[in-house]
């Protein structure tokens, strides 16, 4: 029997931090850009190429994969999972980044506990309910719930 290759988690040197960022360890952060006044909770993974906007809060056990951009003043609750692999060929991409898709979350959006976010665009001010599975773009500010996520209630446009 062979010995496993052991890899440590932590904060790699290629992470770019803004001012006054708070990180609760343990975390796994690498190759990402984190804006000013951001809070990252414990047991969070943020992968390469991710951008997190100013004043955003990412709570424990969230997984933010490559290809995700999160705007300013967002709330990402506990256990939120972002997914970039749509199994376009009937199975996992197995690291083939050409098959991965991106996700964009607009300013002021909130994502509830345990939500799953597939490669989509979520508009500014949208609220995704706990446990929702977002499979399509959200283009109108509102509360979205269920699997697949559907509009429950319209919200005022941000800034109005």
Task: Please tell me what each predicted stretch does.
Residues 16:
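Detector for the N-terminal beta1/A-loop initiation region of ABC nucleotide-binding domains
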């Amino acid at each position: 029997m062979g010995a496993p290759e052991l890899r440590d988690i932590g904060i790699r040197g290629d992470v770019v931090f803004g001012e006054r960022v708070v990180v609760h360890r343990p975390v796994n952060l690498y190759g990402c850009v984190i804006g000013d006044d951001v809070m990252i909770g414990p047991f969070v993974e943020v992968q390469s190429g991710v951008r997190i906007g100013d004043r955003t809060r990412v709570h424990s056990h969230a997984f933010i994969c490559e290809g995700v951009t999160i705007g300013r003043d967002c709330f990402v609750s506990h256990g939120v999972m972002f997914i970039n692999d749509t199994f376009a060929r009937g199975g996992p991409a197995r690291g083939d980044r050409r098959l991965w898709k991106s996700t964009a979350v607009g300013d002021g959006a909130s994502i509830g506990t345990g939500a799953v976010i597939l490669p989509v665009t979520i508009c500014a001010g949208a609220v995704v309910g706990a446990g929702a599975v977002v499979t399509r773009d959200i283009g109108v500010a509102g509360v979205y719930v269920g699997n697949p996520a559907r509009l429950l209630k319209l919200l005022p446009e941000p800034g109005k």
